[in-house]
Regions:
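Alpha-helical transmembrane segments and their helix-helix packing motifs
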Residues: 5, 9-222
């Protein structure tokens, strides 16, 4: 009898206990936040969306630059080199999420808002087109700045060789392989954005982004 009474007291204490709030959003809350973001993106004025997309293209270019500079003089083994290079590339998506820029790959999550019928297919496709073009222009602008700054001459032009090697590796692969590598890449980018959305602080977002982005770069996705 005393054991039963003791158990009831413990159960009552547990029911009244205050448990700490979770340090990240639950999956359902992430989806709701992603849907709301999709609606916002679909209704952005074209000029604003384009400028934000240019910033995203520039940020990803910064990540790519960091990646190629690292590769130009790495004495690590192939696997370790890819993983550390992937961590360098994370800079791009971290800047995109923290600064609120518009990235085409991350904006694929707008399908959540489309699924809930909060936006139309035409709105989504229009947003994707504007953002893709903005990303392209922003990346080209950074290419121009990097060229004019002579970054490619660093380390006895080893950085230039690294850039050419990375680019050549992308254009010499069969298009079918590139297509499916692109799908795999986008899965990992969307996972990184999803995890970043779950975070409540900048540190949460940065840590959440690291593994998915490092993984897709290390695995050679495009």
């Amino acid at each position: 009898m005393s054991l039963l009474i003791r158990k009831e007291v413990i159960d009552m204490a547990d029911s009244k206990a205050e448990y700490p709030a979770p340090d990240c959003l639950a999956p359902a809350a992430i989806e709701a936040k992603t849907e709301a973001a999709g609606v916002t993106k679909a209704n952005l004025p074209v000029a604003k969306a384009f400028v934000l997309a240019m910033f995203a293209g520039a940020f990803i270019a910064f990540g790519g630059l960091f990646f190629t500079v690292f590769l130009s003089d790495s004495t690590l083994g192939w696997g370790a080199q890819r993983v550390v290079g992937g961590l360098c590339f994370c800079l791009g998506l971290v800047l995109v999420l923290v600064c609120g820029a518009e990235l085409f790959t991350g904006n694929s999550l707008m399908v959540c808002a489309l699924k809930s019928k909060k936006i139309t297919l035409a709105q989504m496709l229009k947003a994707w087109l504007v953002v893709w073009l903005g990303n392209f222009v922003g990346a080209l602008f950074i290419v121009f700045l990097v060229y004019m700054a002579g970054i490619y001459k660093l380390n006895g032009e080893a950085v230039a060789n690294s850039m050419v090697s990375v680019a050549a590796g992308k254009v010499t692969v069969d298009w079918v392989m590139i297509f499916f590598r692109g799908i795999l890449c986008n899965i990992f980018v969307c996972l990184a954005v999803w995890i970043g959305t779950a975070g409540k602080t900048v540190v949460d977002k940065v840590v959440g982004i690291l593994l998915p982005i490092a993984a897709f770069v290390a695995c050679g996705f495009e």
